[in-house]
Amino acid sequence: MLQRSVSYFKSLHATAALEGLGSHVINPLQAASMTGNKLFAHMILEKAGVRTPKAVAAFSEDSAMAALEEFGYPAVIKPVVGSWGRMIGLLREKDAARAVIEDREHMFPLYHVYYFEEFVQRPPRDIRAIVVGDNVVAAIYRYSGDGEWKTNMALGGRAEVCPVTKELEDICIKATRAVGGQIVGVDLMESDKDGLMVHEVNNTTEFKNTVRVTGVDVPGLMVDYALALNKG
């Protein structure tokens, strides 16, 4: 069974139900759970030795501000569950951070889990690589839109072909195995200081722009992989 719901909560619960009925789901529940939560994903990637941005988590307004003082500015605040660049903010100094955190104290409890990442100095782009099984089948550069520091295509970014180097393939496969995935999208940054680092692994990765730019039949490769597993 190939899980394709882009909703974290729907895909998580549907996968649990399908596995409970005896189905093999791509990706399995453990992978869906780990990749859909940025804090969980960070912990498992770091434990596996995958280069990933430094991060810190806090669970109250005061501890969040204290964590940022130690962590340093600028910092990036992200919801632990979310997509398409929504609710992600760049905190450049203390007053801005306090305003954002005070607002989140009045939101849904999920937003009371404060997850911060270092602001990585990088070119104005990131990389989306599609992993199917043990292969990186395609990759694109995602460039920031006008006036944006985020590279999400949903925010007006543009895409170009990214060559799949051995370094890129190695880190993507390592990240995929760390989370227990089979078909994933790995998002990476090219740190000026540390080179390639993984900042997200996507459980039900989107691929429209990857297909458009690279010409690779990503959905066909996904289906072929699932059918081959079923025959095996």
Tell what function each PLM region has.
Residues 117-118, 181-193:
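A short glycine-rich, hydrophobically flanked beta-strand micro-motif that places a catalytic Asp/Glu
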Residues 19-22, 26, 30-115, 121-124, ...:
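Active-site nucleotide/adenylate-binding loops and adjacent lid/helix of ATP-dependent enzymes
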Residues 89-179:
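Phosphate-binding site of ATP-dependent enzymes
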Residues 75, 115, 137-138, 184, ...:
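Protein kinase-like catalytic core scaffold
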Residues 13-17:
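A short acidic, amphipathic alpha-helical/loop segment
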Residues 1-10:
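Short, structured active-site "lid" loops
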